[in-house]
Amino acid sequence: MTKTSDFDDKVNYSATGYSRLAKSLIDIVKEQQAKLGYRKEIVRLYYPLSTLRHFFECAGTDNKIAAGVISEQQMLEILAPNNLPKQLTDSIGEIKVTAKNERFCIEIPPKGSEYVYENTADNEFISELIALVGTHGCTMEQITELFYKYSDDIEKKEMQNGEFDCYIRFLNDPDDTYYYCFHDEGCHIIYHRFLPQDYADFGF
């Protein structure tokens, strides 16, 4: 199948919404593999339309996306097989995308799981974080120390929204811009991480 949206060079592709989407998919698959181990199998990930809009609406004219809010149908067209660039399909494969009520299911083929496992560097921080929060008696002090192990330049702020107690993020790591939000449930601590635009949308 000939791709109609191939980009001429790596720099051009890296500035696109497709590249942002691919990074997000790979990050989540790596996190899942750190939690559950690697299996060469189909992975289904779910995104709200708002998150996908952030990937593409800030991606510039090289994606040929008109100004304005991208609808569910427009997003399905953007992610249609004949519009996926070769740079994306060569790594995580021919993804399949469906949507209902602005909730998108992105199906990554076994090739994608294998690619992430064999061709991307281990995320030691995520592996250590998952192991730490899975330890009985884990404390926020220990979690904060783990962040400092990887960078002296972090931000930690208390949250009072009823869902999370605080967030921690790396301030100068372009590869990890997530807000890591933590909640102490008494017997253990849970976390969720959000991209900056999604964090802003939630109004935490």
Predicted regions span which residues?
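Short helix/turn-capping signatures at newly exposed starts of structured segments
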Residues: 125-153
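Phospho-regulated, low-complexity intrinsically disordered regions of nuclear gene-regulatory
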Residues: 96-128, 175-204
